[in-house]
Amino acid sequence: MSDPASTSIPAHATNGEAHAPNDHHHAQLPLSDSKPVSVNRKKQKRRQKQAARLAAERQFGNGHISADMSEQNGLSPTAPASHVSDDHDLDERANGETYYEEIHDATHDLDDHPPNLSNGQPGQQNATARKSKKKKGKKNRAGSQTMGDESSTPLSTPSVSMSQHLPPPLPSHLPHTLLKTSKDRSIWNTSTQEERENIKTFWLELGEEERRQLVKVEKDAVLKKMKEQQKHSCSCTVCGRKRTAIEEELEVLYDAYYEELEQYANNNQGSFEKGPPMVPPPRLYHPPLRSPGQHTRTQGQFHPSRGRIHELPEDDEDLEEDYDEDDEDDEPYSDDEYEDEETRAARADFFAFGNSLTVKGRRQIMLLSFIFPKPVTNLIFTLADGILTVADDLLKNDGKHFIDMMEQLAERRMQREEDTQYGIAAAHQSLHGGHNHGPLDDDDYDEEEDEDYDSQEDEDYEEDEMVSSGNWPGGDAVQADSFLQDAMTEEQRMEEGRRMFQIFAARMFEQRVLTAYREKVAEQRQQKLIEELMEEQTRNEQRNAKKAREAQKRKDKKKLQKQAKEEEKARREAEKAAEEAAAKAEQEKKLEEQRRKREEQKKKREAERKAQEAERLRKEAEKQKRLREERERQAEIERKQREQKELEKKRREEARQNELREKKTKDERERKLREAAPKTDYEGQEKRDPQAKRVSHTGPVPIPASLQHAQALPAYLQSPHYQIATPIVPKAPTPARPRQPSQQGSHTSSPRSQPASTEPSQVSISPRSMAPSQSSGASSVTSKQGHGQPPLLHHPQPSTPLSPLGALNRSHPPGFSPSNPPGLGLVARPPIGHELPSYPPHSGPLMNQLRGFPAPNGLPVLPGMNGTRPMPPGRGFPLDPGHGLAFHQQPIANAFAAQPSGLSHAHSRQPSSSFERSPLDAHAFPISRPSPIKRPSSTQQDQNNRSAQRDVDDLSAHLGSSALLDDSDVPFTSNLSQSLPGATAPGTLPGPTRASFAGTSLFADPLAAKHSGFPIGPSVGNTWSTQIPFGTSPFPSAPTWGTGPGSGWSNNAFAPGGHHRAHTSRPVTIRLLVIQACKQLNMMSPSKGASGYHDVKVVLRQVDQLRPVNEPPISLKEMLDICDTEGNSQNGGGSFSIRSDETGECVKFEPDTNSASSGHRGSIVPGEIGSPVPSSSLPAFGGIGSSTPSVLRQFSSPTGF
């Protein structure tokens, strides 16, 4: 709504116009005079100013509304409320329909009321303000809303009875408590019935003293205001009497009214259904009940609104029944019903000033219309409306209107009394007084009383002016008053005045009771509001606390969840850390285990290495020990030999001296005997001399056929040292007693292998070798004579140094042809026996005296020379012709028996013979080294010699290597040659040692050559024939270089090939065999390469294939033990690696620098550098056709082919 201050008060309706009572009805009342009147500009200006002031007051009042009222109306204390919202309350019925009580307010409807009508024309502005208002044709219905600026009566000013517009709907921001049902909100918004019941209850609850206090307060307030107003007024008797009359009238009215109220309350308590009777018994009016809209007003605010008009039925039923507005309300008023309409409007306006005052029935309402004429009735109601207007403004204007009204009434009463007493009728005195007091002029209110009066007062006086000026006959108030007085009797006028006082008193009392009730309701509502606020605050606090608790719970829950998550995370991290720690520990454990295993392996390897080193050192120590022992033994042997030589030398010196003495004595005795002895004795002596010479010089003994080659030693196999010169003294032979040979075993390295001759024997002084008689002839075996063949005699070596010309001075044994002259290298033709089988073969000289140029008819060439092999022993048929032979080789028939390959156990010493045996029996004994020719020794001397030899035998049994043996140990014998220097294999061809001077050939014999048992070759015959300079292949089918036998020159231009001694021991031999077996397996298995491993069993089989037939079988353990030895230049070099796997043990040979030199010693394997192509006629160094490994050159089979 727009601000009331900004708009002017609308003009009043002219005659024939009526304001619309509400939004639904536009009642038009017929006007008695439609003539326009002039506008009083002064009053209009005053009305405008009053409207502006009223608007400002309303706005100021609306800004100071108490908290409970503002809460009830939905307005804030500071918000300026419109007059519409200040004039009504809300009431929500059960069905939710908003109920608005009709409220009559003194405010003006500024912009929402329907436009005024002028002469039936809508929208026409009324330009006159002094024209008399007509009554409106229709009163407000029950439930209709009228604006505050429209009057409910035609005689009331528009400011008094303003129609009220329909308020807007409830806003959505109102408190929730305002939207509750009426039952729950009874303390805030109550219906009319509930309000009446509450007021009645409040009045009944008051005590008598409180009720009198209320009435007294009203009376005192009115009197006090009146005294204050009359303080500066006239103090004449008339005015004094008037004041007294007013006081008395008020006291009477209030007392009587209170009595009537008390009587009515006592008599009619509980006798009504919808509410208490609002009017006491006839003539008595009690304070009417206010509508709910009036309960929101406080003292000093707006006018109390007027609710519905209720009427009491004739049968005294409840006065709360709403006035029936259906009869003649909806129809517009017509001219025919003017009177009725005017009467009805007057009645409605009359009862409107009492604000819900009711009368005893319609008849009483219509009574005034019948009693008074129409103009008088209008005037009365005009005055009544003015009185009510003053009553409504009492609290706002400090009761000034009421006081003025009372003064007027008092003046009228005094006038009536004077008229009664003096018979003077002056109607105009009733209004303005009659004691020289001029009537109230409108100008008195212009400036002085503007703040105390509102527009309603202006309307009142305006109405008065209108009534006096144009609405009544006579044109002024005096005429109207006279007319009224003329029309009414004095009693009626008094009764009407009293009734007016009663109405006003009831109105004032009603205001006071309602004020008290409102204060109580306000207090209750304030308390309730406080309670509700407290409850709301409590609820809010509880809600906030609940929210806080819920938030705390959520927070705690989130915290717990977070804590649980953190715990879960920590647990997972702990588990992960534990797993990592376990994995790390496991890894550490594995690493530690691996380290431990590596350490163990390292320690094991270290232990193995240490063990191997210790074993190597042990073996080395053993080897050194053996070498040391060997050297010691050799030194001991040499020492013994030197001692023996010295001893022999001494004995020889003694023997020479003895022989000289004996010779001298013998010569003397012989001379004497010759002189004295007969001639027969001389012949017998001559007969004995050749026998003694044979025994002492040559020592002819039967020799076995198999050992003839060992007994007939060539000169180049003897020691290179010069023999001790011993003069040859012819002596008579001294036969010795035959002696049983000793059955003790003799070692080749033992001193017992020396000849046991009683004469000093030839001893080699070489540190490395021994004489062939000590090696090959050391073991003598008693052989049997067979076929009656004459034995071949052993030719002893001369004691003196060999001379190149010594062969010329020597005699030849029987059956041997003499040698050629020295230096020519020519030999005589062998005897015919070589060509004829009936003669035994005879060889030429055993050795040419010229070193390096042997005689062709001397010793035969080595096997394999000139393409033929030597005749094996015992062969009785000649060789096939050809093969380079000039003629058949005559076999040596049964001349030499085959010798077994074993060692003989016969003693090597010459047994003594008795004097009784025949000299021929001596051939049955093994031949021994021939002793120098000397005089036969005596028996005693022979015994001394045997004792000395026995001492030497005992010494050899306890010294040397035999000293290391236990008494129960049996000396180990081997077919292979021992590792002693100078030792040769028994049964092989005797040859020179490496230190010998027997003319070692530059071209050694082939390793595959088979040595015969007797060194007689086919190189006999013509000495001047061509010879093969280098030798021939050992095989018969191989081509030869040169002619066959029969030539006079030797097969070898540089001397016969000497045999190398087999100096290796069995471990060295086995190691060399294993090396060669590995090499052959590498060549046979090229996929494995030269450094591959071979199974030990395969290697053992290969070694067995390479092993000589006369070598004992080699075991696997022995071979593996030999493989552990370190290699050097003697055993083939290199090293062996042995590994073990699931298939077994494997061995690999790893060569080094020593293995290369040892693999080519005197032999070249086919396929190597320097080896000849197979079946080629070109000779190679070391022999042609050598197919056996070089290891086989160290030893040879002692047998034949």
From Swiss-Prot:
Its main location: cytoplasm. Residues 40-50, 130-141 have a biased composition (Basic residues). PANTHER family: LD36051P (PTHR31780:SF10), STRESS RESPONSE PROTEIN NST1-RELATED (PTHR31780). Residues 1-178, 268-341, 429-478, 535-707, 724-848, 899-952, 1150-1169 are annotated as: Disordered. Keywords: Coiled coil, Cytoplasm, Stress response. Belongs to the NST1 family. It is found in: Cytoplasm. Residues 520-673 form a coiled coil. May act as a negative regulator of salt tolerance. It comes from the Eukaryota. One of its GO terms (cellular component) is cytoplasm. This is Stress response protein nst1. Residues 769-805, 926-938 have a biased composition (Low complexity). The keyword Coiled coil applies. Residues 116-128, 145-164, 293-302, 740-767 have a biased composition (Polar residues). Residues 313-341, 441-466 have a biased composition (Acidic residues). Residues 84-114, 535-553, 563-692 have a biased composition (Basic and acidic residues). It holds the Pfam family NST1. InterPro entries: Fungal_stress_NST1 (IPR051195), NST1 (IPR025279).
